[in-house]
């Protein structure tokens, strides 16, 4: 637990990347589903 000051920065950055990546994948999946429904 010596890296207690450096670790939260990496954790916040990791949470921000996943917080943006997960809705993006879900949004792309919904767009592809709507395109399959329209055709």
From Swiss-Prot:
InterPro entries: PSII_cyt_b559_bsu, PSII_cyt_b559_CS, PSII_cyt_b559_N
Compartments where found: Plastid, Chloroplast thylakoid membrane
GO molecular-function term, one example from the UniProt record: electron transfer activity
Cofactor: heme b
Keyword annotations: Chloroplast, Electron transport, Heme, Iron, Membrane, Metal-binding, Photosynthesis, Photosystem II, Plastid, Thylakoid, Transmembrane, Transmembrane helix, Transport
GO biological process, one term: photosynthetic electron transport chain
Cofactor remark: With its partner (PsbE) binds heme. PSII binds additional chlorophylls, carotenoids and specific lipids.
Segments passing through the bilayer: 14-30
A GO term from the CC aspect: chloroplast thylakoid membrane
Membrane topology qualifier: Single-pass membrane protein
Amino acids binding heme: 18
Protein purpose: This b-type cytochrome is tightly associated with the reaction center of photosystem II (PSII). PSII is a light-driven water:plastoquinone oxidoreductase that uses light energy to abstract electrons from H(2)O, generating O(2) and a proton gradient subsequently used for ATP formation. It consists of a core antenna complex that captures photons, and an electron transfer chain that converts photonic excitation into a charge separation.
Family: Belongs to the PsbE/PsbF family.
HAMAP family: PSII_PsbF (MF_00643)
Subunit structure: Heterodimer of an alpha subunit and a beta subunit. PSII is composed of 1 copy each of membrane proteins PsbA, PsbB, PsbC, PsbD, PsbE, PsbF, PsbH, PsbI, PsbJ, PsbK, PsbL, PsbM, PsbT, PsbX, PsbY, PsbZ, Psb30/Ycf12, at least 3 peripheral proteins of the oxygen-evolving complex and a large number of cofactors. It forms dimeric complexes.
Protein name: Cytochrome b559 subunit beta
Organism of this sequence: Adiantum capillus-veneris
